From Swiss-Prot:
Highest taxon listed in the record's lineage: Bacteria
Protein name: UPF0355 protein SACOL0457
Family in the record: Belongs to the UPF0355 family.
One Pfam assignment: YflT
Amino acid sequence: MADITVVNDTGELYNVINQKKSEGYLESELTIISKSKLHLNDLHDSEISLISTSGTFSDRMTKLLTGEDGEHAVLSRYNLAPDELEKYKQLILDDKMLVVAVRDKSSHQEVHENNSAYEEIDITHFAEASKGPKA
């Protein structure tokens, strides 16, 4: 389940990010959703996802032609109830930011078990095991 926090300004945004990190969330588990693109260089250099619901110019044109709702499209990935979805959509349209924290429950154990790069190889070699000439 997504842990969503509503934020009013960038000062509060940094406080919420630090709070989520202190709760044990990784940067890669945090997403910031806003109506327009955030110009915060220190966040662009982090693993925190920044999503603007307005999108690029081509996204806006596509939405105009298809009638797609950008806020609904972004929020739908978090499996929210319809009333919650409408509430958060309206908050985004009111220029609030959402900090979404979702724990990454995926396991990478299979990669470690099946990838030969992680295989430990015994490279001890004794002379008597050699097939070459013995001197």
